[in-house]
From Swiss-Prot:
UniProt keyword list: Capsid protein, Host cytoplasm, Host-virus interaction, Viral attachment to host cell, Viral genome ejection through host cell envelope, Viral penetration into host cytoplasm, Virion, Virus entry into host cell
Name of the protein in its database record: Major spike protein G
Domain of life, source organism: Viruses
Organism: Enterobacteria phage phiX174 (Isolate Sanger)
InterPro entries: Capsid/spike_ssDNA_virus, Spike_G, Viral_coat
Protein role: Attaches the circulating virion to the bacterial lipopolysaccharides which serve as receptor for the virus. Determines the phage host-range. Probably triggers with protein H the injection of the phage DNA into the host cytoplasm upon conformational changes induced by the interaction with host lipopolysaccharides.
Subunit comment: Pentamerizes and interacts with H protein, F and B pentamers to form 12S pre-assembly complex. Joining of twelve 12S complex form the procapsid.
GO cellular component, one term: viral capsid
UniProt cross-references to SUPFAM superfamilies, sorted A to Z: ssDNA viruses
Keyword Electron transport: no
Length: 175
């Protein structure tokens, strides 16, 4: 229910430029950049996506010190491929005791309400995520994953993830 009240995705004013120049999609989905806590915007202008069946992802580490078991994660993304791949984009939740470099075998998938238009994909959505680790000692990560049977292509775009920690209460006028 809370999700319907988030009207826009607030991305960071500054974004990190991806240093990685190429990625090979794999069933273990390589992580594009070391995850940051609670919020991250990643810009890439010429990422070479090598041929392969699988995916790649950009993720954040969730803040588990909040007083709620569930938190909203908002995602905003605009990505374009030179080729027109048929791909699946989603949010994934997973746990790890160390900084992840690939997607582990156990993860939860959350579909997104995005829009495909040729080689372009746009999404602005939010999902309620369980932020408490199911295994003691693990950290919880949420990532934006792109999955396809890729042919070699170039990819460019922006992906922004935010853990919505502050809840804004709107008061209605008295009648």
């Amino acid at each position: 229910m809370f999700q319907t009240f988030i009207s826009r995705h607030n991305s960071n004013f500054f974004s990190d430029k991806l240093v990685l120049t190429s990625v090979t999609p794999a069933s273990s989905a390589p992580v594009l950049q070391t995850p940051k806590a609670t919020s991250s915007t990643l810009y890439f202008d010429s990422l070479t996506v090598n041929a392969g069946n699988g995916g790649f992802l950009h993720c954040i580490q969730m803040d588990t010190s909040v007083n709620a078991a569930n938190q909203v994660v908002s995602v905003g993304a605009d990505i374009a491929f030179d080729a027109d791949p048929k791909f699946f984009a989603c949010l994934v939740r997973f746990e790890s005791s160390s900084v992840p470099t690939t997607l582990p075998t156990a993860y939860d998938v959350y579909p997104l309400n995005g829009r495909h238009d040729g080689g372009y994909y746009t999404v602005k959505d939010c999902v309620t995520i369980d932020v408490l680790p199911r295994t003691p000692g693990n950290n919880v990560y949420v990532g934006f994953m792109v999955w396809s049977n890729f042919t070699a292509t170039k990819c460019r775009g922006l992906v922004s993830l935010n853990q919505v920690i502050k809840e804004i209460i709107c008061l209605q006028p008295l009648k």
